[in-house]
């Protein structure tokens, strides 16, 4: 839940060809954070499968409510309605949508009714968190942003 409104701010700037280098770095940080999300989603699902009574769902929902409240308040304090393309309403909608997505991913029901759409979907191509190749770069100036390692070259251990 935390950080993601900040990521979207830089993707919004990138969508206007502003601070492109910063957006590249934010994209890497975003991917790293998502790897943590996936790791913990898998761990939580497995723990729940092995021991269904390990987690009290009420506590999980309270934690999510608090995180959503804090993230909305912080984003509204930092950005509010002062950036074209970001409003207090879109901040609330995005944060609650994201919370619902995270809850679904660990096998729980969504917390917020009516928040089933990402209001910043148009920025997902700038995030390029799945490595779909939506981000274009000058071939001679670009850098590799994928975590994928080549497996076609063998014998490097001998050096």
Locations of the language-model features?
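Charged/polar, low-hydrophobicity segments characteristic of intrinsically disordered regions
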Residues: 35-46, 76-78, 107
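Generic structural signal for well-ordered, non-transmembrane alpha-helical segments
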Residues: 1, 27-38, 65-72
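Inter-helical turn/loop segments and adjacent helix faces that build the functional surface
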Residues: 9-28, 43-62, 79-86
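Acidic/His metal-coordination segments adjacent to aromatic residues that form catalytic metal sites
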Residues: 1, 14-20, 70, 74
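Extended, helix-rich structural scaffolds rather than catalytic motifs
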Residues: 52-159
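Alpha-helical bundle segments that constitute or directly flank the non-heme di-iron/ferroxidase center
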Residues: 1-14, 38
């Amino acid at each position: 839940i935390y950080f993601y409104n900040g990521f979207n701010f830089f993707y919004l700037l990138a969508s206007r060809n502003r601070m492109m280098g910063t957006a590249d770095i934010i994209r890497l940080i975003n991917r790293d954070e998502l790897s943590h999300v996936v790791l913990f989603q898998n761990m939580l699902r497995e723990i729940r499968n092995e021991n269904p009574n390990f987690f009290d769902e009420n506590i999980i929902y309270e934690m999510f409510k608090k995180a959503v409240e804090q993230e909305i308040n912080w984003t509204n304090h930092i950005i509010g309605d002062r950036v074209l393309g970001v409003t207090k309403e879109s901040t609330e909608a995005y944060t609650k949508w994201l919370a619902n997505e995270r809850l679904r991913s660990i096998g729980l029901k969504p917390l917020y009714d009516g928040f089933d759409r990402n209001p910043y979907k148009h920025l997902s191509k700038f995030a390029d968190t799945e490595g779909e190749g939506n981000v274009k770069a000058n071939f001679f100036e670009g850098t590799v942003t994928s975590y994928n390692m080549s497996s076609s070259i063998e014998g490097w251990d001998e050096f």
